[in-house]
Every structure is written in C-alpha cells, then in structure tokens.
Design a protein with these regions (language model features):
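Membrane-interface junctions of multi-pass transporters
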Residues: 361-407
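Short loop/turn motifs at secondary-structure junctions and domain boundaries
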Residues: 97-98, 337-342, 393
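Short, intrinsically disordered, charge-biased short linear motifs at domain edges
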Residues: 102-107, 324-330, 348, 370-383
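Radical SAM enzyme [4Fe-4S]-AdoMet core and its adjacent flexible, acidic
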Residues: 2-33, 37-55, 129, 176, ...
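Secreted/processed peptides and extracellular or luminal domains of membrane proteins
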Residues: 118, 122-125, 347, 365, ...
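Short cysteine clusters
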Residues: 112, 116-119, 341, 354, ...
Length: 430
C-alpha cells in the first residue's frame, strides 16, 4: 500500500471550493495502488550515461550565443518539439475515444525543501516515487499518445541522481521533457547533467525578488544558478521561463521578475494565487495567509495585469495569452465560466505511488481513476466533475490545451509559426 493520505474528513470537506456532491464523489472512494511486480523481480531505471554529448560539455558557451540577439533553432530541435507536441495532438484528433494524453505530470517527489504559503502540493512525510514506478510510468506513457513528460513535486530535484535518471530514460524513449524547479538545488553541475540528458525546457518557479513572508521562492538566493542556466541554454538547445504566481504581497516583485526575464530574452508564465480546490490535511496556512488575495487587493492586481498585457503587446514573451491574462481579473471576482478543460483526456498526473488523477487539484482525491497500465478515466464522470470545478480553477496548462481543441485556432497558429520557419514561438494560441 502507498503511504499517501487516503482520507479527508468531513470538516476538511467544508473548506472545499467545490459543491458538496462533487466533494463527496472525489473523497468518498478508495483509489487503487499501482500493481506490484512479482516477488523478487525489480524493474529499476538504468543508470544515466554522462556525458552523452561530450562535445557540448567542453565547448565554449560563446560559440553558441545568438547572433544579433536572434536565437536559431536546429532542424533536429524543431522536429523533437513536433514529435513531442504536434504529432500526439493530431493523433488525439483522429483516434477513437476520449483518453489521448499529450502531457503527463510525473510526481517523482511529494516532499519539498521550501514552504510557500499558497502551496498544498507537498507533504514531507510522504516517500517519493520508486525507480520501478518511474520506469513503468514512462513505459506505459510511451504506449499511449503521450510524448511530453513533466517532472513534478514537491521539489523534483530533492534526489538529483534520480531526477537525472528519469530525464535520461525518458529522452532516450523520445519524450520532450519539462522540468519545473524552485532553483535552490539547480546547481551548475546538475544543470550540465540535466541539459546533457536532454531536458527541453526548465520552468524556474520564482515569486519574489528577495524572500518575503510566505514566499521563499525568490531570485536573489538562486541568482548564480539562474545566470548559469541562461548561459548554457544555447548550446544545449533547451529553453527557460520564469513561472510566477501573482499573490497579494508580491505585485512589485512580479514587475521586477518580468523585466529580468525580458532582459535575458526568456518568457514568463503567470498564475493567480488560488486557495486549495479540495482541503488538504497537510496544508497549514488556510487562515491569516499573507499571500491569499482579498477583495481590497483587486484594484492593484488588475492594474498589474493591465501592465503585463501592455508589455505583451509590446512583444515581451509570455506563455499566457492576452485574453487569458485579462481573465485573471474576472477570476479573482469569481466571474469565470466553463472553458472546456482537457484534464483526464489530454493531460493527467501520476502520483508517487503510480495511481492516476486528472489534474493537480485532485491529487488528494480518493476517487479511483486507475493506475499506470490500467487507466480508468471516465468521460461522463469527468464532465460532471468539471461542471463544478472549471469555474473555480485557473489552470494555465489545461486552458492552453482547451484552446488547442479548436482546429481553426491550431491551423492559424501553426501557419504563423511556419511563416517564420518555426524559429521560436510567435504569438499565443488566441
């Protein structure tokens, strides 16, 4: 049996942002564990070979710096992105059925080395994923349409050798690998190993310039790691973006971090601070939280969002579309409607024990969506659940996926990229 929390009490249910029927459905069952291997048989990850690309490890960084500020992407890098995203997408449009994942979030850790006061997605009493579950997860995903693998936690680099082996194994099977981290453990030697293994993008999560109450993910403590990561991206062929959560107490920091990203030619991705969708037994900051947005903060947050929109209209690189940024102003006022979430259909999460769930907010749910090798995503159940949760959720990734499931949008967006030779991303999925 897994050591994940299995129950949520009635008093905890009262704190949920979902309706009572949905909460009871999500917390009243008992999910299955991943099927164990026969006694005596192990299925660990192979050791990661390093360096795989010694010519890059020893090459001068300056040789690969952009000419005239314009980064050039090689044909192999473009094809790798196509095989990761475009090919699975088109397969999902023509294959029968509803379950065709494009991206999977592999929770290799549920522990974290920091404590952000908005974050419920960790419990330092829960053991991380085993090598066997990691390998079986990747093998199973390879048998589906999925070719984008995102490590997830907690902090994914708590066991750096383990993370390196996951990345190496996944990239050798053709996955486009996405690695999010708070950057504290992302030291130069580890950057070299992960980059050599083939990480496609680093999502560097920072919410403040210097640490402040409730927001330890700051730039100052990781500045040297950040600069090394930026410098090495050109020769290894990965991208970097800053992932910033807009809270009530970091509005000036958001501007400063956005300017830093622009100065370094990288993109930014914004989230709006949300309270947990389902109450979490390990979450300790439900009351008197300095980061949660209050009604008196709305005007200042709307002003910040308008500033971000203006910067994007000037050509600053952002993952969020202008439309989605503008919707943040509606979301904080509880005015968001349904938006065709694709969780459980084209995205999913794999918990540390190998059990499945549609999305991050449902990590603690006890409803049985199956396990690796035996998924049980039910279209009717997902539709009923999303009727309650969609208006209460501001998932950036699933909203982008929702926009993709409009063929006209995709064709127009791909045509725009093709006109520029697929040299970087031009515009958002509008």
């Amino acid at each position: 049996m897994s050591d994940l929390p299995r129950t949520i009490t009635a008093s905890q249910n009262n704190a949920s942002r979902l309706d009572t029927v949905t909460v009871e459905q999500l917390t009243g069952g008992e999910r299955a564990d991943a099927v164990t291997l026969p006694t005596g048989k192990r299925h660990p990850l192979p050791n990661a070979h390093f360096p795989r690309r010694p010519e890059l490890l020893w090459a001068a960084d300056e040789k690969y710096f952009p000419t005239n500020g314009h980064r050039r992407w090689k044909a192999g890098e473009i094809l790798h992105a196509m095989h990761g995203w475009a090919v699975p997408f088109f397969k999902s449009r023509v294959l029968p059925g509803d379950f065709h994942p494009l991206i999977a979030y592999l929770f290799n850790e549920w522990k974290c080395n920091l404590e952000c006061h908005y974050c419920w997605a960790y419990d330092n009493h829960v053991k991380g994923m085993t090598e066997e579950v990691a390998r079986r997860s990747i093998d199973w995903l390879h048998s589906t349409t999925c070719r984008v693998l995102a490590l997830m936690g907690g902090e994914v680099l708590l066991r750096p050798d383990f993370a390196h082996r996951i990345v190496d194994y996944a990239t050798q099977k053709g996955f486009w690998v996405y690695l999010p981290t708070n950057g504290r453990l992302l030291r130069p030697d580890l950057i070299d190993r992960l980059a050599d293994a083939g990480v496609a993008t680093f999502n560097l999560a920072v919410d403040a310039w210097e640490e402040k109450p409730g927001l330890p993910k700051a730039m100052v403590p990781i500045r040297k790691n950040f600069e090394y990561l930026i410098r090495k991206q050109y020769k290894y062929g990965y991208t970097v973006f800053l992932n910033i959560n807009i809270c009530r107490n970091n509005l000036d920091d958001v501007r400063q971090l956005t300017e830093l990203a622009h100065e370094n030619g990288i993109a930014t991705d914004y989230h709006i601070c949300e309270e947990p969708m389902l109450s979490q037994a390990s979450f300790r900051h439900a009351e008197n939280n300095p980061v949660f947005i209050r009604e008196e903060d709305h005007a200042a947050i709307c002003e910040l969002i308008d500033w971000l929109i203006a910067r994007q209209n000037e050509g600053w690189h952002m993952v969020n579309s202008v439309e989605r940024l503008a919707q943040m102003k509606s979301f904080i006022k509880h005015e968001i409607d349904h938006w065709n979430c694709r969780a459980g259909q084209n995205s999913l999460i794999i918990r540390v024990d190998g059990s499945l769930a549609p999305c991050f907010p449902t990590y603690s749910a006890t409803y049985d969506w199956g396990t690796i090798e035996n998924p049980k995503m039910d279209a009717k159940q997902l539709q009923e659940m999303k009727h309650s949760c969609e208006p209460n959720c501001f998932s950036t990734l699933n909203h982008i996926l929702a926009f993709c499931y409009n063929d006209g949008r995709v064709i127009r967006w791909l045509a725009k990229q093709a006109m520029h030779g697929f040299q970087g991303i031009r515009g958002n999925m509008e």
